[in-house]
């Protein structure tokens, strides 16, 4: 368990706990449970009262989180599903409302360092999988080997905002005629041909685009957000941590669309401290937004 805690440092933990406005007896959802970094502290704040509901689509991660949370006194229940099933989960628990919900988007350090599923361009030997759940139909390799040139180009532009998306898509289609994509290294060979080495870090955008497409991340997130105003109790809080502009745009649009029900608690986006960024590189691109369920107007 010490290894799990060393792998995963929860981003903006102090800010999350503060803005969730926790107290004993509340019902709290961690929609992106991961390895339970945030949830561990949430459970402590509930002090044996109330309920923590944790959701994660990755069965392997959920198992590790369960082990971690079981060492803390408190009530929790975990669900191995996508977080757009919020209303169904509450129905199963005979609950109508919750008091707080957290979304910490993206993927965890575990997925990069321990999953062996090809989430990072730093692991050329890993298979091009990128699925959070084995129930997901398509792998990253499937997409690279079957999508048309225009579909690939649109994917890299829409989900990765990659300026060389057309050139990259063309090269991928050419390459797969001779050799199918199977490993991270196969994709890196093409990226090296298309994206200048001074922009090597830009491979991140390509991997981001594939990960989002494989797991349908943005659509699932939108569907989940649309349920929040109807399950959050009056005065309840929603806290969202995003890591790139596509996610953040969805959150901003959500607050705008539901301004009659959700009131931003902070007008400005909240960012991690310089100290945290030094200690945890994953926090460097994090943006936290928080809203509160208002009285029905």
Curated annotation (Swiss-Prot):
Belongs to the methyltransferase superfamily. RsmH family. It catalyses: cytidine(1402) in 16S rRNA + S-adenosyl-L-methionine = N(4)-methylcytidine(1402) in 16S rRNA + S-adenosyl-L-homocysteine + H(+). GO terms for molecular function: rRNA (cytosine-N4-)-methyltransferase activity. The keyword rRNA processing applies. HAMAP family: 16SrRNA_methyltr_H. NCBIfam families: 16S rRNA (cytosine(1402)-N(4))-methyltransferase RsmH. Keywords: Cytoplasm, Methyltransferase, rRNA processing, S-adenosyl-L-methionine, Transferase. This is Ribosomal RNA small subunit methyltransferase H. GO terms for cellular component: cytoplasm. The gene is rsmH. The lineage of its organism: Bacteria, Pseudomonadati, Dictyoglomota, Dictyoglomia, Dictyoglomales. One of its GO terms (biological process) is rRNA base methylation. InterPro entries: RsmH (IPR002903), SAM-dep_MeTrfase_MraW_recog (IPR023397), SAM-dependent_MTases_sf (IPR029063).
């Amino acid at each position: 368990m010490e290894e799990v805690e060393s792998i995963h440092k929860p981003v903006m933990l102090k800010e999350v706990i503060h803005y969730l406005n926790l107290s004993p007896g509340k019902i709290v959802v961690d929609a992106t449970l991961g390895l339970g970094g945030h949830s561990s502290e949430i459970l402590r704040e509930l002090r044996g009262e109330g309920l923590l509901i944790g959701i994660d689509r990755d069965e392997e991660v959920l198992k590790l989180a369960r082990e971690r949370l079981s060492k803390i006194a408190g009530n929790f229940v975990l669900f191995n599903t996508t977080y757009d099933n919020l209303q169904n989960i509450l129905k199963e628990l005979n609950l109508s409302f919750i008091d707080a919900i957290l979304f910490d988007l993206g993927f965890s350090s575990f997925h990069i360092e321990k999953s062996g599923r090809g989430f990072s361009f730093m692991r050329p030997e890993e298979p091009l999988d990128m699925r959070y759940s084995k129930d997901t139909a398509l792998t990253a390799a499937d997409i690279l080997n079957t999508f048309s040139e225009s579909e690939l180009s649109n994917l890299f532009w829409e989900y990765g905002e990659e300026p060389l998306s057309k050139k990259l898509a063309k090269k991928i289609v050419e390459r797969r005629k001779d050799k199918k994509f199977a490993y991270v290294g196969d994709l890196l060979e093409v990226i090296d041909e298309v994206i200048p080495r001074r922009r090597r870090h830009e491979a991140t955008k390509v991997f981001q685009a594939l990960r989002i497409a494989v797991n349908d991340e943005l659509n699932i997130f939108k569907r989940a957000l649309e349920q929040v105003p109807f399950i959050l109790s009056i005065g309840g809080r929603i806290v969202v941590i995003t890591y790139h502009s596509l996610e953040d745009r969805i959150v901003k649009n959500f607050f705008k669309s539901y301004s009659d029900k959700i009131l931003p608690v902070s007008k400005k986006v909240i960012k991690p401290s310089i100290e945290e960024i030094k200690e945890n590189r994953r926090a460097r691109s994090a943006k936290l937004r928080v809203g509160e369920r208002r009285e029905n107007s």
